[in-house]
């Protein structure tokens, strides 16, 4: 088995960008969902499922520079932490974020048609489950077969896609450790999914009917699950093409 895709977004909800490698620390992928947008009126982190047009934008954080590409503008600079914090709701969990000064909030407010604030999050603060997520090509192929149209890896927004022939091998990884490149992770649980998985990863418009397919064959405790999440137990760099090793497997 090997890593066939790696990716993340530096701004929660923006387009999930494929990358040649990902650096993992004990807090998770470096640069992943480091920033988020906050709705100051409602006191909560902006939700992708309610704002799918965010996928029409990309956010890259490289060497301290945040570059956001919107349909009609590119906004780039070094984010300035203001020292002002906001404690807001993130899917029923209270998180404390630091407000960021710069042009990004204005650009996104104009794009979304509502006032938003850009904030910086701590590691894992605006991640629904554990910091790393995995899917397998075998599982994506099975979901595509059931949907009747190809499901793109980017629709599932996972940190890593692992190439496998059989579907849902990842179910057997729960509670086990995996080696990926220089890093090691421990798989925690299956990932509950929402209708974001059916959106076109570049436009945010409806593309597939995967959630309904999961409801038919991947229902667990009232949730529709696909892929697994994991914590990092050993930091390191993971490249596309790196071998994936299951601890204890022959």
Label each residue range with its predicted role.
Residues 1-250:
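Metal-cofactor-dependent catalytic cores
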């Amino acid at each position: 088995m090997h890593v066939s895709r790696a990716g993340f977004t530096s701004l929660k909800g923006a387009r999930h960008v494929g990358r040649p490698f990902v650096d993992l620390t004990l807090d998770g992928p470096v640069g992943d969902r480091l920033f988020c947008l906050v709705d100051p009126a409602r006191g909560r982190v902006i939700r992708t499922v309610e704002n799918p047009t965010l996928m029409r934008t990309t956010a890259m954080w490289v060497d301290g520079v945040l570059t956001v590409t919107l349909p009609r503008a590119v906004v780039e600079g070094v984010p300035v932490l203001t020292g002002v914090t906001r404690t807001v709701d993130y899917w029923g969990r209270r998180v404390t974020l630091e407000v960021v000064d710069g042009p990004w909030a204005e650009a996104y407010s104009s794009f979304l048609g509502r006032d938003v604030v850009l904030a910086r999050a701590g590691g894992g603060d605006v991640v629904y489950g554990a910091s790393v997520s995995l899917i397998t090509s075998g599982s994506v192929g099975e979901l595509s077969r059931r949907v009747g149209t190809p499901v793109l890896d980017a629709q599932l927004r996972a940190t890593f896609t692992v190439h496998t022939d059989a579907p849902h091998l990842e179910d057997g990884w729960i509670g086990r450790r995996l080696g990926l490149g220089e890093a090691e992770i421990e798989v925690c649980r299956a990932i509950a999914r929402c209708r974001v998985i059916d959106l076109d990863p570049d436009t945010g418009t409806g593309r597939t009917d995967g959630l309904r397919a999961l409801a038919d064959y991947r229902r667990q405790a009232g949730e529709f699950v696909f892929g697994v999440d994991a914590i990092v137990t050993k930091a390191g760099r993971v490249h596309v093409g790196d071998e994936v090793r299951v601890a204890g497997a022959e």
